Design a protein with these regions (language model features):
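Conserved single-residue anchors adjacent to enzymatic active/cofactor-binding motifs
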Residues: 1-226
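Low-complexity, intrinsically disordered short peptide segments enriched in small/polar/basic residues
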Residues: 2, 245-248, 268
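Short strand-loop-helix active-site module centered on a catalytic nucleophile
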Residues: 32, 86-94, 153, 250-272
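N-terminal alpha-helical segment
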Residues: 193-194, 214, 232, 268-272
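Long, amphipathic alpha-helical segments that form or neighbor coiled-coils/leucine zippers used
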Residues: 215-258, 262
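Charged/polar low-complexity intrinsically disordered segments, enriched in acidic residues
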Residues: 273-277
């Protein structure tokens, strides 16, 4: 068992998948602009994207869903006019998978078969395994060749280089994901990472609503032990009172969510994010 898999096994309460799905639904434009700028620039954003959950569930049901994997399928219109509409399949992969590229190829073909539309597949690698960034599925025998090449965004590489001082929402959520993985099994390390990320939000120029939205996503993703959750709650309350900035503590669920079942808190988080829109 690799260190990464062992860490994941120790951290089953953190809901990376749920946080990512909620974030992508609410901030698709921002995430595409940061993670895949060339794709973002090719889309006609005057037309509202359409989510294709039913079609995606058919493909995943046939191919089989893996752990630590988030898939979204959305129909968008291109600026080029080559095709009025295409399907963008975006997958976020939080752990190493040996047959990742071939499964991506299978999904791409399955979506095309079900929807009869061209599919643009994008992959966000949100794992800790350096040097692992598959971006092509290739099968060749004699004169026959099948090749699928897809864009990849490796979060840990960007965070260590060009995103080091980037505090946009997509970069912050990437940082929360990587910090959560790095501190799996390290309760105090997770607490410090989450505390630094949350308290740092107030000095980044975000509005009150934006701070709440980011906090709710980070809170969803970076689960803490109950005693450390309570300690962080106290620190946030004191911090906001000192600054007279009741951004997070004015969210109705803030105090009560800490003492309830994590599953209920996750469901309420999704509702609260919708209310903040």
């Amino acid at each position: 068992m690799t260190d990464e898999v062992a860490a994941l096994d120790q951290d089953q309460d953190s809901d990376y998948d749920g946080a990512w799905k909620e974030a992508l639904r609410r901030f698709l434009r921002e995430f595409l602009a940061k993670y895949f700028p060339l794709v973002y620039a090719a889309i006609d954003w005057t037309h509202e994207p359409e989510w294709c959950d039913k079609e995606l569930s058919q493909v995943i049901g046939q191919a089989g869903k893996r752990n630590r994997q988030v898939d979204v399928l959305v129909k968008v219109r291109l600026l080029s006019g080559q095709e009025q509409w295409i399907l963008v399949h975006l997958e976020i992969q939080s752990s190493y998978e040996e047959a990742f590229a071939s499964r991506i190829s299978l999904y791409n073909a399955g979506i095309y078969w079900i929807c009869q539309r061209r599919v643009l597949t994008l992959a966000v690698l949100a794992d800790l395994r350096r040097g692992w960034a598959p971006d092509e599925d290739l099968f060749q025998v004699g004169p026959f060749e099948y090749r699928l090449k897809f864009p990849v965004c490796k979060l840990i590489d960007h965070l260590d280089t060009d995103w080091r001082d980037d505090y946009s929402l997509p970069a912050l959520l990437a940082r929360a994901q990587i910090d959560a993985l790095r501190t799996a099994g390290d309760a105090l390390g997770r607490y410090r990472a989450k505390r630094n990320l949350v308290l740092g939000l107030y000095d980044l120029g975000y509005t009150e609503q934006q701070v709440r939205e980011i906090f709710l996503l980070v809170d969803w993703m970076m689960h803490l032990r109950i005693d450390l959750e309570k300690q962080l709650t106290r620190e946030i309350v004191e911090f906001e009172e000192a600054r007279k900035m009741p951004y997070i503590t004015s969210v109705e669920r803030f105090a009560e969510a800490r003492g309830e079942a994590r599953g209920e808190a996750r469901g309420r988080t999704s509702v609260l994010l919708s209310q903040l829109a």
